[in-house]
Amino acid sequence: LSVYLDATFFPNLNELDFMQEGHRFDFVENDKSKDQIVLKGIVYNEMKGAMSSISSQADQGLNENLFTNHTYGYNSGGDPQDIPKLTYQNLLKFHEKHYHPSNAIFFTYGKIDIPALQNEIQINVLKHFSPSAEKIEVKESKSFRKPKYALKNYKPLSNDENNHHVLVSWLLGTSLDPVDKMEAKLIESVLLENSASPLSKALEVTNLGSVPSDMTSFDTYKKQMYFTAGLEGVSA
């Protein structure tokens, strides 16, 4: 436990590690262009791969427009276009602000000695901090008064013009009530469980697109739920 607490609240990240893990300029490793410089970094390369698919770009575009200027509107792993803008000092400031015990909830589970566990947290973490006045919370995104339309461009996989991805989403209420979440997943099951389900069938047989979007679902994992239906392979 002490190792996890130390790694979370007191990570040992020096600037050289940041350059390796985050982003840096490096030489191309091949015989043809030894003098060519490229942008590298473990996290940078990971996020380039994660955001290379059409679905991941569409999902990010959807969240940006459903949750404008909101926590959920930002790529949690880092947008590859923005990662090179991050500085070492800004990362330290972010950690200092957000990874503070005042912004933490400690959960315990199982048949364990709770007082002993709390004492270990006190010794390893809490006694090293003072209460923070920062109020960090995930606020509710504002409801839409009218439909919102958004367009996001991506590099197509081919020159096929029937390669558009169209999504329709409804931003709903909070998902704090487990009964509401269960009912939402039940509705999703009725609509999308298999090819005979009404919405799945409608999306599969329509000539408006080639296949249903794999983002067609009821999302109950954020503070506010939202329902999405869509098609891939839509013509221009």
Give the residues covered by each predicted segment.
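Charge-rich, well-structured scaffold segments of protease-associated domains
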Residues: 1-146, 152-183, 189-199, 205-236
